[in-house]
Every structure is written in C-alpha cells, then in structure tokens.
Design a protein with these regions (language model features):
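Metal-dependent DNA phosphodiester-chemistry modules and their immediately adjacent helices/loops
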Residues: 200-220
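Acidic beta-strand-to-loop metal/phosphate-binding motif
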Residues: 129, 167-179, 203
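RNase H-like polynucleotidyl transferase catalytic core
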Residues: 147-153, 196-207
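Active-site-proximal loop/helix of nucleotide/amide-processing enzymes and allied scaffolds
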Residues: 156, 173, 179-189
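Phosphate-handling DNA/RNA-contact segment within nucleic-acid enzymes
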Residues: 1-2, 48-166, 183-184
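Non-catalytic accessory segments of DNA primases and related replication-initiation nucleases
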Residues: 1-62, 71, 83, 93-102, ...
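Alpha-helical scaffold elements adjacent to nucleotide-binding pockets in ATP/GTP-utilizing enzyme cores
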Residues: 162, 186-190, 210, 214
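A residue-level signal for conserved active-site and pocket-lining positions in enzyme catalytic cores
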Residues: 29, 81, 172, 211
Length: 220
C-alpha cells in the first residue's frame, strides 16, 4: 500500500463533511440518493477543486492532492481489506478526463465491493459483477449485498479465480452500451470458466440505464 493512501482518504472524507468545501460533493450524492450511513460505511469522500478555505485543515500533514479533483472518492481495498488505491467518480467536468479515475493498482486482481460484501456473497454462493462503484454502493444501500465492480467492463480470468473462493455462480451485468457489450463478449470468449456458472445478463436494462439507475427506479 502506498504509505499516504490512508492519510489522503481521510482528507477526502473530511472534505466531504465540511459545510462549504464538501457542498458540491454532498449535493451530488444527495441526487444519487446516497445516505449518510452509506457514506460512512464505504468511506466516501470528496476531492475539492481549487483553493481550500484556510480554516479547513491547517495541519501540515494534509496536502492539496490534485489527481482526483472534482470527484467523489472511494477507497479501493483488496479482498483481505488492505487499501490498494483510491478511485474517483467525476462530478465536475475537467478537460477530457474519464468518468472514473484512480491511482495505479492491479485492477485485474481486485473487485470493488468484494471485501465489504464477501460474507453475503459466500452465503448466497452468488456474485453480481457490474461496471461502476456507485452501482455497488447503491445496491448495498438497497439491500442487494452480493454486487462487486470490475472497474468498468473489464472482468478478467484473475477476477474469476478470486471469485471462485467465495461463490460458484456469477452474473455479469454490464451497461447497455458499446463498452458493456464488448466487455460481455470478452467474458464469453474466456478460454475457460473453470467450475463457475457464468450468466451473461444482456438486455436487462433500457438503453442508457445501469444497475444504479434501475435500482433507484424500482426501489421507490
């Protein structure tokens, strides 16, 4: 683990809670229906853009990290619970940056949410793989605690090897767009699925919808 990841994650969590620094981030999470309980459970934070009020944090240990500016942040943990990276979901559009960004880590060997949900996944002997981190968090908040993210439509054989320790059934549910269809086809073309039962769930959501938006619509 990079030695300052815990420190940086704490900075983002404090920024989100700050009445002025975190306002944009909190407003965004409110529009997504994310509760305070969920924010605390998943250690969600906010990477503020530009100048920080002098009364935010005067401690020398906190520095103005910039890679994830304008993003809601999530710590990424391995299945053993060790923090491997921090990811950010874009809220403020900056240049041509991708929707999700993160510090380098071995994304082929980590699934977002597996650590938090592994007990339910083992109990149900089933896991749902989706693209976005907010899909996982929204599902958890609404009681569906067997979901993990492959950081986009990028499920790998390494992921399958890890999943096999917890579940025998995998439902791959990617977005109904080109990237989602490409990712689903890639899983279909794997050289082997081992002893896993893999369901490639296509055509479930209407165009431009994902698991997160579907859950919000059908949980009302």
């Amino acid at each position: 683990m990079r030695p300052d990841l815990e420190q940086e994650n704490l900075y983002y969590r404090k920024a989100l809670k700050h009445p002025t620094v975190g306002l944009i981030g909190r407003n965004y999470l409110e529009t997504r229906g994310i509760t305070e309980e969920t924010i605390d459970k998943w250690e969600i934070g906010w990477s503020p853009v530009g100048c920080i009020p002098s009364n935010f944090d005067k401690s020398d240990e906190f520095k103005p990290w910039t890679k994830l500016w304008g993003r809601i942040t999530f710590p990424i943990t391995s299945q053993s619970g060790e923090m491997a990276s921090i990811s950010g979901r874009q809220v403020i559009k900056i240049d041509n940056k991708p929707k999700y960004d993160h510090y380098a880590f071995s994304a082929r060997k980590i699934l977002f949410g597996l650590y938090q949900n592994k007990e339910d996944i083992q109990k149900e002997d089933r896991i749902i793989i989706t693209e976005g981190q907010l899909d996982v968090i929204s599902a958890w908040q609404n009681g569906l605690k067997i979901v993990a993210s492959s950081f986009g439509a990028h499920c790998s054989l390494d992921h399958f090897a890890i999943i096999s320790r917890y579940a025998s059934v995998i439902d791959v549910i990617y977005d109904e767009d080109n990237a989602g269809w490409t990712g689903t086809q890639a899983v279909k073309d794997f050289s082997t699925w081992g002893d896993l039962i893999v369901n490639l769930r296509t055509g479930i959501f209407p165009a431009k919808e994902d698991l997160d938006s579907w859950i919000k619509t059908h949980s009302k």
